[in-house]
């Protein structure tokens, strides 16, 4: 373990919130240090197509957008550190953070650690993770070329995953516990076009009862009808779970005020909107937002957190 590194402002996370905070903080001469976390670029790097980022009307990829954000942050001399923070001590200043590679202290902290894919929680699902069960179609979809797969979920992510896989797999079985989908209309329209083409098969009013498999991996699913309770089996080679995300806040439990895992912020009308229950600690992006969860809103709160941190540090030095 190397010596402790001190930063005036430390930013945790390298998604839209973290990189935007870094850009604004660097331009304010705060000399931010950004710790990337395990997944550099965050969730967005697993998104194949983005068509609602202002200015990129021709459509862009998540990984491409995050690479440009990284370059933007580096242009203003943000120091990027490839490490993962596994423990923090926010009880006194400077704040202490303990990484896999290095330890840090800082005068102000912006938490932009994002969220991770949520799984259903079945033992059989856990047993086949990495052997047919995944939460990322763009990461693992190519393994299932011309093979049948399933997708579980009813929101934008599930429909996007199904549409992406429809261009790879032989058949995509989209499974949803309700009788209608919550996705945006443009995605629903594309979904039903693929249904008409026979590329996607809908299984509504169904829940996952069991992941079936053998020593080689997933071989199928057992579904339960939510109205009748009847069970049915599907033969397929892969399952993609798209039922939402959980905020990455485990290391902050007992140190910050949380609400269902999300960091509570002040959201004040007089500024300081991203301030947490600990003075000098700010939160941005999916780690504090359970309603909107968009790349653009994450970036916006990253900007707000940088401005809040700048005001806080200025007041400390006054």
Swiss-Prot record:
One of the record's GO cellular component terms: cytoplasm
Short name of any one Pfam family annotated for the protein: Pyr_redox_2
Enzyme Commission code(s) on record: 1.8.1.9
Cystine bridges: 136-139
Catalysed transformations (reactions): [thioredoxin]-dithiol + NADP(+) = [thioredoxin]-disulfide + NADPH + H(+)
GO BP annotations, alphabetical order: cell redox homeostasis; removal of superoxide radicals
Additional observations: The active site is a redox-active disulfide bond.
The protein's assembly and partners: Homodimer.
Protein name, entry field: Thioredoxin reductase
Originating organism: Haemophilus influenzae (strain ATCC 51907 / DSM 11121 / KW20 / Rd)
Lineage: Bacteria, Pseudomonadati, Pseudomonadota, Gammaproteobacteria, Pasteurellales
């Amino acid at each position: 373990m190397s010596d402790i590194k001190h930063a005036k402002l430390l930013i945790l996370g390298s998604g839209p919130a973290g990189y935007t905070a870094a850009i604004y903080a660097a331009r304010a001469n705060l000399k931010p240090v950004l710790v990337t976390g395990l997944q550099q670029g965050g969730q967005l790097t697993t998104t194949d197509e983005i068509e609602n980022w202002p200015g990129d009307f021709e459509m862009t990829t998540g990984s491409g957008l995050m690479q440009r954000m990284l370059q933007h942050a580096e242009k203003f001399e943000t120091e990027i550190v490839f490490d993962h923070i596994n423990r923090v001590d926010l009880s006194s200043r400077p704040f202490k953070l303990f990484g896999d590679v290095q330890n840090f202290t800082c005068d102000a902290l912006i938490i932009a650690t994002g969220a991770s894919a949520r799984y259903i929680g079945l033992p059989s699902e856990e047993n086949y993770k990495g052997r047919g069960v995944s939460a990322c179609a763009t990461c693992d979809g190519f393994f299932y070329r011309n093979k049948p797969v399933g997708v579980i979920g009813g929101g934008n992510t599930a429909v996007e995953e199904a549409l992406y896989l429809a261009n790879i797999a032989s058949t995509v079985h989209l499974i949803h516990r309700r009788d209608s989908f919550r996705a945006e209309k443009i995605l629903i329209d594309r979904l039903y076009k693929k249904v008409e083409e026979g590329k996607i098969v809908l299984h509504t009013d169904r829940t996952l009862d069991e992941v079936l498999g053998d020593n080689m991996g997933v071989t199928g699913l057992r579904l339960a009808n939510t109205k009748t309770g009847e069970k049915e089996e599907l033969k397929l080679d892969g399952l993609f779970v798209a039922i939402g995300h959980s905020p990455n806040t485990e290391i902050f439990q007992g140190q910050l005020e949380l609400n269902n895992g999300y960091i509570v912020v002040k959201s004040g009308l007089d500024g300081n909107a991203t301030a947490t229950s600990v003075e000098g600690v700010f939160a941005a992006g999916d780690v504090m937002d359970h309603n909107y969860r968009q790349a653009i809103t994450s970036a916006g709160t990253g900007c707000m957190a940088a401005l809040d941190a700048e005001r806080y540090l200025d007041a400390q030095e006054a």
